[in-house]
């Protein structure tokens, strides 16, 4: 290799083409290339020069030659130095010089090497066909995957995982969980191939109804990750430990902190045993049973309670006398000396005074601008932030890294705000912040980082998203709070780093132009970005304009958030504490502060919750598909949920078990409903819910067994159902318990709807509306945390968890309870995995109150509709109805409408008693209509869930309704959140009548 480089140096002057050839043809890495760590010891020079490490380094060196950063002579020396280093790794070490380590169990893992390989299914020559239900797809054969296993050496731990990406032709896509092909000792996991197939079926089970079953579902990608670790002993867990024991939240740990004595010896002696280096640990201690724990997140810094420790399956108990409970990690061992017993108490929600938080935490507001590269990854090129009244920015490939370093240099506790940061900005900064923190924790929902805490040596960084409180775009929020106007920026003109330095003679605005073309029974729709140039001359680069735009965004966000908090404090006497991170949390605090003193809202046990949760029925959607070219009237309920909370009674107190129904009280019951009619009666209103195969439906039925609240059962009686009770929970008291809460917010909203305040539109109304919409009721029915998500080191945590023995139900121990073995998925396939722990936590809110509010809301709308005999509702969604005008007494209908709490309101936009002249209904959340507004202008309203409004037209809905075989295919771009990065994805969404 060096001879070739020397020859090249002597023969050519302009060598760029030859260097490119040499880079691609000589320093070549393919699927057969081996790592230096998988080569046999004392391999030949040629074998070492064929390794991944040598050739990857060669490619880097030749890139530097091409850029004229180094000479060929320097390159030769560097390659020779690399070879000598790799040869030293490949040599057999003198075992006589190796210090003997007492036991492998108390060593720590150090990452020696890690790599990954992305394979297209076409790379596998002997792929086999996997068939499941109506699906058939090619997957790698078992032998081909086994052939990828590296050569195994002793003294190393191997984490070798495979995961498959499954995709459909339109919107569907899924990734299987990581499956270990070998265990950490290098032995093949005999059942790995069956587990791969099992995980494929779980992905295929999620194929939604809008994917045609005969559609081609394929295995698109096979990702292999390999991490090689080595055990190396270290001394201790904590710095400057002086005490013998440490008290955690629910257990006490003997630390074995005497640095002059072997920690294992200290533990043996503490357990009443005798130290003897010739014996195993089991023989040295009197306890017959040993349970060994390791930190769940593979770091002792994260351990605060038993919930942060994992162990093999074991019968949960707190016996620390007859069982030796050892905590082993990072070259050290301790003894758990006491485990506190769980004390179950009946939780109660009651009136609480809102605490005013005085914690000193600085605030930083930031925004990121990025472009989408050829691989569809979002590439940040600019970050702006505000701190202590000053604006800063960084640009370039390292802008995020530089921002994180700057923030950490402040050495103070900081709340980091980004508008919609939970779904975008935090996913860019997280890898840099996580790599530097001591420990961290997050609340993750739907791949959104709704909250985060990252601990550093001199600071804590909190991640909070203002959007999760105000629930609208920054543009709309800026207008509602009368702050600086947010600008617009043509993001789509940037495709590469080079574009940033361009100067457009005239600045540009982007308009989206819809393109349609028909293919058989399918109408295909996509859009193009059209550039509209301004008249004024532009002298700034694209980057300079982006900086100004980004600064305005940061200022707007800061001003909105500060004003929102000040208005909350002034008008509702509440502060947003550091650890309050959503609107529903905030509203629940306000609601609890307004409860009557005598009210105690009972929180159900997990066993009770498992029953009453079946009475939670979500948003009611009724859709009578068709083309309606006649007069249609619309109405919605003024603040439906708040009206149900104020105008109807709700229960409180501890329930009792019953097998009957007392309609003078409130309860939640398992009943059989039997309709008196044999077929759907005329004028039946679809308000009685039921679930069939977990799918919610509102259609008429003859007989059904299910769980229902009293308000739902009152509706059922009115609709001709006989009710037979099997069991239930009856609550002792009921009252108008939410009146103070609703009155405070609703009167505040109404007072500032047409007020004479200096600022108009009045932002106080916006604050009241936000708090009212949050309602608190959403928290009542929030299910207990059934899934914990962690961002962990790639492969390593998965490998250690896979070692743990499970019971026949596939359960291991986390702390004091049994849970299913954690699931692991690749995140960036470089540094991090997503770990999911499925569990059942106790409820923390009064679930029956949420059920009561949901049921009462249906009852409110039902009673409003029953005012009109023969009413024909063609579409209804939660709080709104579309009605054939001829089916109601129009004058009576108008007289019943108004703007008071709980009334029907027939206003569309600003037009009262609007008449819809044409309406197309294609299914739930899929409709379009036209109406004349109060200025005699024809207005079109379009709605199709999951499709951007700018892609919709009335003619599309007309085409859809002409035939049940007609399909519309919308093609657009979406953002996929990966927690540690963001990608864009071209999506095709097929729409048919449902």
UniProtKB/Swiss-Prot annotation:
GO annotation, biological process: DNA replication
Residue spans crossing the bilayer: none
Listed EC numbers: 2.7.7.7
Catalytic activity: DNA(n) + a 2'-deoxyribonucleoside 5'-triphosphate = DNA(n+1) + diphosphate
Gene3D superfamilies in the cross-refs: Palm domain of DNA polymerase (3.90.1600.10)
InterPro entries, per the entry: DNA-dir_DNA_pol_B, DNA-dir_DNA_pol_B_CS, DNA-dir_DNA_pol_B_mt/vir, DNA/RNA_pol_sf, DNA_pol_palm_dom_sf, RNaseH-like_sf
Keyword list, A-Z: DNA replication, DNA-binding, DNA-directed DNA polymerase, Nucleotidyltransferase, Plasmid, Transferase
GO molecular function ontology, one term from the record: DNA binding
Other facts: This DNA polymerase requires a protein as a primer.
Family: Belongs to the DNA polymerase type-B family.
Record-given protein name: DNA polymerase
Biological source species: Kluyveromyces lactis (strain ATCC 8585 / CBS 2359 / DSM 70799 / NBRC 1267 / NRRL Y-1140 / WM37) (Yeast)
Lineage, top ranks: Eukaryota, Fungi, Dikarya, Ascomycota, Saccharomycotina
């Amino acid at each position: 290799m060096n001879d070739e480089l020397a020859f090249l140096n002597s023969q050519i002057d302009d060598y760029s083409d030859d260097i490119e050839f040499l880079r691609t043809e000589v320093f070549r890495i393919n699927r057969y290339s081996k790592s230096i760590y998988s080569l046999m010891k004392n391999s030949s020079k040629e074998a070492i020069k064929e390794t991944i490490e040598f050739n990857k380094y060669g490619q880097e060196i030749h890139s530097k030659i091409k850029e004229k950063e180094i000479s060929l002579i320097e390159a030769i020396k560097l390659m020779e130095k690399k070879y000598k280093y790799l040869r030293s790794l490949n040599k057999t070490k003198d075992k006589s010089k190796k210090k003997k380590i007492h036991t492998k169990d108390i060593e720590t893992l150090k990452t020696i090497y890690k790599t990954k390989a992305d394979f297209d299914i076409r790379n596998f020559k002997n792929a086999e066909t996997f068939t499941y239900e109506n699906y058939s797809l090619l997957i790698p054969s078992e032998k081909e995957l086994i052939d990828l296993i590296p050569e195994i050496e002793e003294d190393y731990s191997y984490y070798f995982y495979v995961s498959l990406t499954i995709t459909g032709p339109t919107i569907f896509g899924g990734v299987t969980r990581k499956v270990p092909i070998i265990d950490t000792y290098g032995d093949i996991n005999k059942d790995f191939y069956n587990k791969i197939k099992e995980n494929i079926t779980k992905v295929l089970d999620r194929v939604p109804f809008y994917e045609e079953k005969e559609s081609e579902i394929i295995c698109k990608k096979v990702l292999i990750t390999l991490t090689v670790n080595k055990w190396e002993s270290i001394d201790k867990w904590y710095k400057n430990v002086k005490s013998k024991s440490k008290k955690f939240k629910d257990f006490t740990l003997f630390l074995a902190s005497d640095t002059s004595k072997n920690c294992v010896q200290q533990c043996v002696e503490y357990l009443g045993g005798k130290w003897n280096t010739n014996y195993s640990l089991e023989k040295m201690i009197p306890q017959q049973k040993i349970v060994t724990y390791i930190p769940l997140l593979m770091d002792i810094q994260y351990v605060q309670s038993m919930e942060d420790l994992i162990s093999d399956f074991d019968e949960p108990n707190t016996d620390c006398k007859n069982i030796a409970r050892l905590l082993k990690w990072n070259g050290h061992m301790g003894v758990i000396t006491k485990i506190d017993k769980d004390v179950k108490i009946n939780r109660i929600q009651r009136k609480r005074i809102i605490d005013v938080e005085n914690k000193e935490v600085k605030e930083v507001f930031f925004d990121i601008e990025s472009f989408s590269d050829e691989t569809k990854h979002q590439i940040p090129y600019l970050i702006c932030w505000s701190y202590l009244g000053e604006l800063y920015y960084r640009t370039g490939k390292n802008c995020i890294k530089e921002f994180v370093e700057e923030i950490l240099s402040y050495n103070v506790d900081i709340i980091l705000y980004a508008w919609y940061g939970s779904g975008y900005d935090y996913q860019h900064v997280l890898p840099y912040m996580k790599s530097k923190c001591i420990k961290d924790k997050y609340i993750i929902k739907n791949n959104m980082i709704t909250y985060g805490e990252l601990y550093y040596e001199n600071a804590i960084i909190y991640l909070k998203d203002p959007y999760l409180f105000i629930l609208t775009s920054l543009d709309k929020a800026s207008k509602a709070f009368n702050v600086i106007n947010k600008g617009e920026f043509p993001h789509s003109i940037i495709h590469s780093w080079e574009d940033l330095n361009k100067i457009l003679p005239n600045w540009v605005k982007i308009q989206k132009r819809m393109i349609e073309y028909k293919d058989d029974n399918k109408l295909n729709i996509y859009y193009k970005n059209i550039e509209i140039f301004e008249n004024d001359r532009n002298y700034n680069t694209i980057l300079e304009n982006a900086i100004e735009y980004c600064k305005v965004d940061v200022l707007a966000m800061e001003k909105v958030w500060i004003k929102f908090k000040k208005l909350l404090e002034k008008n509702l006497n509440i502060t947003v504490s550091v650890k309050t991170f959503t609107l529903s949390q905030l509203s629940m605090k306000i609601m609890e502060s307004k409860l009557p003193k005598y009210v105690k809202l009972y929180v159900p046990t997990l066993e009770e919750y498992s029953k009453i949760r079946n009475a939670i029925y979500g948003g009611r959607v009724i859709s009578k598909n068709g083309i309606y070219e006649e007069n249609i009237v619309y109405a919605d309920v003024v603040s439906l949920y708040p009206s149900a909370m104020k105008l109807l009674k709700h229960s409180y107190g501890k329930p009792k078990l019953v097998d009957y129904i007392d309609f003078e009280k409130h309860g939640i019951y398992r009943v059989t409903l039997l309709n008196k009619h044999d077929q759907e009666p005329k004028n039946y209103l679809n308000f009685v819910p039921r679930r069939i195969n977990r799918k919610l439906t509102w259609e008429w039925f003859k007989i059904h067994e299910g769980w229902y609240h009293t308000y739902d059962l009152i509706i059922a009686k009115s609709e001709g159902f006989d009710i037979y009770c099997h069991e239930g929970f009856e609550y002792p008291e009921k009252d108008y318990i939410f009146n103070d809460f609703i009155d405070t917010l609703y009167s505040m909203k109404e007072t500032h709807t047409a007020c004479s305040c200096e600022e108009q539109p009045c932002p106080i109304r916006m604050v009241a509306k936000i708090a009212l919409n949050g309602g608190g009721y959403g928290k009542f029915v929030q299910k207990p945390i059934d899934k914990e998500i962690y961002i962990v080191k790639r492969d390593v945590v998965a490998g250690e968890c896979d070692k743990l023995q499970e019971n026949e139900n596939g359960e291991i121990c986390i702390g004091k309870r049994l849970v299913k073995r954690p699931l692991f998925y690749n995140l960036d396939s470089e540094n991090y995995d997503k770990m999911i722990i499925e569990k059942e936590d106790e409820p923390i809110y009064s679930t029956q109150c949420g059920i009561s509010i949901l049921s009462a809301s249906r009852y409110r709308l039902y009673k409003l509709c029953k005012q009109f005999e023969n009413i024909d509702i063609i579409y209804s969604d939660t709080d709104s109805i579309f009605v054939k005008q001829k089916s109601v007494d129009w004058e009576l209908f108008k007289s019943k409408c108004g703007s008071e709490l709980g009334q029907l309101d027939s206003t569309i936009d600003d037009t009262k008693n609007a008449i819809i002249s044409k309406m197309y209904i294609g299914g739930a959340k899929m409709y379009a209509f036209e109406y004349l507004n109060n200025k005699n202008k024809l207005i079109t309203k379009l709605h199709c869930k999951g499709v951007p409004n700018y892609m919709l037209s009335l003619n599309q809905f007309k085409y859809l309704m002409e035939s049940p075989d007609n399909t519309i295919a919308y093609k657009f771009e979406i953002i996929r959140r990966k927690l540690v990065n963001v990608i864009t994805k071209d999506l095709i969404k097929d729409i048919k009548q449902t």
